[in-house]
From Swiss-Prot:
One of its GO terms (biological process) is mRNA cis splicing, via spliceosome. Residues 1-20, 53-159 are annotated as: Disordered. Its main location: nucleus. This is Pre-mRNA-splicing factor CWC15. GO terms for cellular component: catalytic step 2 spliceosome; nucleus; Prp19 complex; U2-type spliceosomal complex. Involved in pre-mRNA splicing. It comes from Saccharomyces cerevisiae (strain ATCC 204508 / S288c).
Amino acid sequence: MTTSHRPQLEARSGAKAAAYTPTGIEHARLLPGHTTLKYRKFKEEENLRANCAQEDRSNDKSLEEAVMNEEKQDVVGSGNLQETRSEKDQKDSLQELLVTQKNKVEDKAELEGNEQLKGGNSSRRSWRKGTAFGRHKVTKETNIKEHATKKSASGYINDMTKSEYHQEFLHKHVR
């Protein structure tokens, strides 16, 4: 494997001259790593930390319970407020539902109006099924105008530009 993909840390200028000054670039693989050691932690310290964490959690739970008790008292005292809030919430949600339904109907109407996004007629043949020379009949007329007005009756065309398929293609997609 070549080393040409690696950075050039020192220019190769033959023998190290007196004017040689090393660059400040250091390769990442040459830098020292893992210079510190992990020491074992004493189990006593870990137990103290775990106990402190459990006490904090229990304090948080007691605070949450106090807040819940206050809310229950507020709910008992203000039953009518809760009912009006729920009614307002229901009205808001109904309005949002109506707006989203209206938007869906508008989007559907736009999609139906867009002719390019329509599926089209399923009876149309795929463009992949057509061939350039294979299924087209030869016209014996030399006049192209006559060929355009009159359909050929027998044989195959060896010139793609005079084929009926090519004329239809030009009419559909180019003109």
